[in-house]
Amino acid sequence: MKVVKFGGSSLANGQNVEQALNIILSDPERRVIVVSAPGKRNDDDIKITDLLIKYANMTLKSENTDEIVQTIFMRYQEIGHFFGVADEELKVIKDILLALPSRNYPNSSYLMAAFKAHGERLNARLIAMIL
């Protein structure tokens, strides 16, 4: 059994995810897959983790987060659409994002860590949908 990890730039868009999946599927011994949050698609782009940090900060300031949630979701949606994943299946990702502010966190540091961790969590869910 082999464990493989893919970083953010390897999972930044549909084409990169496709290359990662080809690597995974080329060896049946690759059974454990560890994924990072999607990284930058180009030099001017923003990593999902940075968008989640912004989302957390906006939540802590009680600011409207509709736009940042949509921006984050659209990144996952774009990758999902590349593989033909239906919007109905992808909706769970948006639902998880929308639920983050309503969870109980012991303090702001915990909230920040939880928001950031969702980059990987949501990407793992997306890759599972694709596979």
Where are the regions a protein language model picked out?
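Nucleotide/pyrophosphate-binding catalytic subdomain
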Residues: M1-I130
